[in-house]
Amino acid sequence: MIDRNSQFPEISLCEVLNRLRAGATVVTPNRRLALTLTRKFDQIYTRASVSAWHTADVLPFSAFLERIHSNALYSDQAHVVPQLLSIWQERLLWQSIIVSSDADHPLLQHSQAAELAQQAWELLHCWDLMQKFTHFPLSKDANHFLSWANSYCDITKNKRQIDAARLCDWITENYQCVFLEKSTSFIGYGFDFFTPQQARLLRKLHDDGRQVSVAYPESSDQIASAPCLKKKGHVEFATTDDEIYHAAVWSRTRLEENPQALIGIVAPNLTSVRNAIQRIFKSVMYPDACWISPNGNDIVPFNISLGLPLSSYPLIDAALLCLSLLQKEIPFNRASQFIHSPFWVGGESERIPRALLDAELRQLSEPAITLDQLVQLIKKIRGEATCPLLLQCFNELVALRDTKLPQSSGYAIFARVFTEALQRLGFPGERKLNSEEYQTVQKWQSILIEFASSGQNAASVSFYQALSHLKQIAQKTLFQPESLDVPIQILGVLEANHVIFDHLWVMGVSDEQWPLRPNPNPFIPVELQSQTQLPFVSPSQAFAYSKKLTQRWLNSADEVILSYPKNDDDGNALQASPLIHSVAKIPIHLATWQSQDELIAQSCKLESDSDHQAFALSEKTLEKPLKGGTAVIKDYAACPIRALIKHRLN
């Protein structure tokens, strides 16, 4: 690990902005920091009422490398430039190697093994461990990985291919041939450390006469001399939902006090609480949610940085459902979703007739249904009269399946067939798409391109394998539609690193979530990872890094609140993280805020009526001996309403 200050001079943020005006290139560890710095740069010109200016050259380090490779492809040295594999081309190659070697060492999850192998390959190259790894005492799993890695290296070498893990080394080795960047000043912004691979390229830039510096949102001196007037403290709440609710009310209160304030919400466990945050923040920011326009164009004042799997978006789910219909039977409830979907031709004009048709189909259909059975049922109940466009959609799918769907082919051919199937159905529908839906369609098209190109190292595959791979890409691709700049940013731990706020709330800082847990790669010996000081390998390294982040949070805003729930979702007791014991416990005073439901309840006069007796048994029932005995008591103890239905209502 290369220390942040060990090799390159550190400059102030003001100097970074000045050099950006002069055409410097700034690289960051992640996209969030690049966006933050770009916005800060743009604000200088907007406040000066400048109408146009050159875009700041700020981008993540990985994008910087890809740009160099892309420029080299269009230079007179293109003949020496290897093909850069995408993440999914890489993943599929690893998976095919693992599957082919699976006869002697069976694995249950090839895709997960491929993902871990890809991560191990990246770590070994980023941290210059490949040579040490090959001479290190290896476990059985590590030996399997070494065998896969040798095959992977041979295949990519023979096909003149390279991956993201080796791109930085390739640029450094071929620097004189391919480095076409015109900038003479390069700045690493917000890096806690440089990997040996990154440091080697930066030294190459420095040796070539280019100015290389590092910078941070606040310099070390500024952090050390931070004023003691900042409001800091930690708070505890009963549950996670209660914690999120108070964070939402606090955010709304601070926003009402100063609409220009930048408010940060950080959650170490953002993946697990994302849906709860979305729901609770929306209910607090928009208590009258029933009045929000149905087209989804309303602007909410918060943004959650963590995207959702692309497959979870309704538009993509509908597309994958359509393709699934081509192959096999599906549950009828999924077929019902297809019928109600607005993303096909007739989705709006036949909306009501399709709902009535679906109700009739439910009376006749089996729990699972095929495309042919669905067409037959619709014709049986004369659905072509009320929903001709829907029947046309199904007929188009049948025709395409029977005439153009290959049993086995390459990914590019299947991508073309998938696209045609959706086009025949009028995807993405009749109505005008809102911004989120439009961006989702654009992302769908990009993963189709990714899917089509991912089979360069693969032989022909079946329809089932092709569709499974497309679904895997959609499930693993996290997508967050772009939105306008909003004042409340909800971030994960690493994304919030080095970001400055006016107000900051860090939630979930319990002993279960903080500090971060070590996460070593299973294919690399733990001892080798510890010797190299890879991040998050040992508990001590994870603790030290988490401690540094905690201190950074406390200096990143004028008001900082750390919170945790006293109980988890299973009712287990939680304690405050040991990293926040030194932070004083404070009461939190929020303005009185009532939800829309509470306001409605207060505006009404509620009536109560005691109704605790069931109706009397009829005379006809009493003429016969009553049955039940102890079963009545047993059923009532288990579920009163179920007992009433069973024994009184028969």
PLM feature spans:
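Polyanion-engaging groove/track-forming segments
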Residues: 1-650
